[in-house]
Amino acid sequence: MIFTTQIPSLSDAWPRAVRALESARDVETYHARLRLRHPLAIYNISLSQVVGRFSSALTELEKLRKVTGFGGERDAKEEAFLVALDSLLDALVEHFDDCNNVLRCFFRNEADPRYKKLYSKFKSETRAYRDHVAKIVNRIKHSQGRLRSVFFFWPGGNSVGYFVEGVNAEGVVGPDEDIHAGGSTAFSVARDFRLHLCGIYFVSTHLAQAIYEASGVRPGGKHVSAQGVDALATVIRGVSCVPPVFFPDEMKKAIPSVKMASDGGVTISCGKDNRERAASFPSAHVKVRFMGDGVTRQFRIPYLGQSARKW
């Protein structure tokens, strides 16, 4: 995902699809025929759900980061965070379906050649990000892939992350090889949360373009009320405050960034030119918590090579 969007202020932080749908509010739609809400209502509800779950994940992350030591309290906080994260990932996948329904509302049926063309274009433009999230969610739902937390500690800092658990051909449990490179990496929250915030705006930008083309409305300066934007603004602030300490392999990927300016503006972007806004760590202690199943005795810890640890 290579993308940049400028937000003039947090009171005007709505993704572009909101403005596009407000501009097209008086255009005839077929939502009732499809037994769907008005397209603006669909998007508002979907965005609200994503933002609400993002907020919950940030709250649980903050609680987890404040825990010192190991044991029962940390285990409970880890589990609460992973539950909130799982819920956020579900909402992101549902958001893609909701965006498709928004676009459907502008056409009498899906056989319309214009719908097919616009949907195909929207799907193609957002496929890489959607596939990334959907693969994680599908693995969790259909292959018993559990989310597991991983922590790196070093003097003066730490980095929280997670991986999707899988089983390799030798029966070793560890990071899923179809999701994590080599079955030995993980996702840092620092990158992951920035990526998903960027993804919300990335998908919305492409949806907005499709809405303008479907409705015939020209992009303009349609005013959008700031009412209700506070929750989104809080998430933006929260994500920007997560220390940008990425896992080692992530420094080779596109770097998502949330940059708050002194004038109140925000730049949300993803690209390799953001490398100066992120850092990794040279060495650290690692903590991983697996769940026993009464049978498995071999586990692989992220970033510690291909060898399995026996328990």
State each model region's role.
Residues 82-124:
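Flexible secondary-structure boundary motifs
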Residues 1-82, 112-311:
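Acidic, Ser/Thr/Gly/Pro-rich intrinsically disordered interaction regions
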